[in-house]
Amino acid sequence: LFPQVFNGQLFFTNTSSNGLTDFENFLTGNVQFSFGGGGVYNHTYRQNDSAVFVQDNWKATKNLTLNMGLRTEFLGAWTDGACHIGNIESDLTKSGTYPFIYPSCANKLGVSGLTGNAAGSTFNNSVATGLGPRLGFAWDVFGRHSTTLRGGYGIYYDREDIGAVDQLSFQSPFIPIVFFPGTGLANFFAGASPLLNPNAVPPAGTLSSAWVPCLARLVSFTPNNPAGDGSYACTGGPGVNSTQNLFVLEVPRHFRVPNTQQWNLTVQQELGKNWVLEVGYVGTRGIHLRETRDGIQSVNATPQNPFTVTDVNGNHYTITNNTFSNAIARTPTPGLNGYSGYQIFANDAYSIYHSLQTTLSRRWGSNYLQAAYTFSKNIDATSSGNTAFNTAYNDQSNINASRGLSDFDRQHRLAVTYVYQIPAFQHSKGLLHAALGNWAVSGVSIFQSGTPFSILDSGSGDAFLGLGSTPLLGASLAPGASIPSGLTSGSLQSRVAKGYLNPAAFTPASLLYYPNISASECSAPTGPDPSGNTCVTGFGNLGRNIYRGPREQNWDTSLIKFFKIGERNEVRFTADFFNVWNHANFANPAFTDVEVGSAFGKIFNSTGTP
């Protein structure tokens, strides 16, 4: 289980300091950060769900039918029969309270310093209850079956999958995680205590008291000193593994499950003989959706908004600038590492979908034609339930900073489906009928918008987030540029050949203190700050998913031949032709990180058929 954790992982990213892409850094062995863990990995996960419902169909009048129902869900939180999970309540550190939460069964594990008093799920409530009403109607408006109005509304709950409890299994001392710059991987399996080596992890299958966490306390600190990061002591709590060196994972202790509201209103109108038109509005709203982020990222300290820290003796220190060294001290929850050692797995994301959906269809004889067009917009705070990396964009302290078009949004989509019985030679006889009669053609043709994408800067935000904390950091517009100017012009073929994006329209996020020079100049010995400690970047000013990839189309066609066998049987021969025009659908630009150099904004791949 979790081989990627116990074997360790190396990560290669795009880097501005040497101008290399992630793959080039891989080829040269230039590791940006590493990840690994050890400990116990056996679990006995359990979850209990139940539901009751009532439902009835009522024909209120001869023209109106109602469908009504109510479903009540009782969705249980996951527990672990092996008791190898733990949680953390980060806000407790603000009052100096030990933040780690373990189930009461942890007292039976016989590990010195490991105690628990929480429920088996570690949550305050172990069951989430939800009411799911259902209401639908169908109305024959004029009583002639030519005009029908249909509508419906419902709330639907989604049982939480195993992801949440998996997060809890990575808590120290069960599977301590270390997440350090690349050179730290060399010491992962040294076998030393974390007191001697902060990168050490326990051997696989070992549950050791050496990795029971304690809450770190600030002992001394020199504010606004670029080279000073303060010193910490392990004084808070029963353990010895200091939290400023730990990667901790939090799941909010109020258990809730995602739910979706869906509604629709559609009118169906008969248009002459065999033609039917449907026009409808369909909407969906999701709340309590899963997301992962660093909710306690290092704060922005300025002379106008200073940040004050307090040491174990009650001395106060005021921070008015942002450096790499004081990043952990700028964590809003004292003692934790909000710079690169924390992830929250929360159900506080959301989504909203609105659409106009139309369908025009006709049936005549054995023939059929349908054209379905959708004009829609899907917005969310995050489009992924990834549990390994943060899914929020840019500022991790505010989930609304990630609001944008969904990764899978397609503004326009037209699908045409048809079956056509070729009338020629239908009534011929003999060999002519056998060879040329009873042929048909069918197919599906799809035309749709491309999917959205963002312009990224892997070097941005390092004043607030450590390397590897999130893959979704935005770049900035270049001075004088606009969002439309970020796209090149011309035919799609020419843009694929020369570049889909205009590199001159974008720039890496600015340095907080030296906005007019590049990060590489700042870190050079001759730069404004030879130590490099104040050469930190803020977040870019570009939003999430502001551009859209190439539109797509596809034609699939079938040629069908029927052979009659007697009066009641037939044999059908079908030849299928996929992408019959051999039309290439191009993927989004392969590299949208402004740090990658000449590969930026170019399309190198095609995508599958829509």
What role is predicted for each listed range?
Residues 146-185, 287-293, 441-447, 451:
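Surface-exposed extracellular loop regions of Gram-negative outer-membrane beta-barrel proteins
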Residues 1-142, 388-391:
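Signature of Gram-negative outer-membrane beta-barrel scaffolds
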Residues 81-84, 164-167, 386, 589-590:
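Short, glycine/charged-enriched secondary-structure capping and boundary segments
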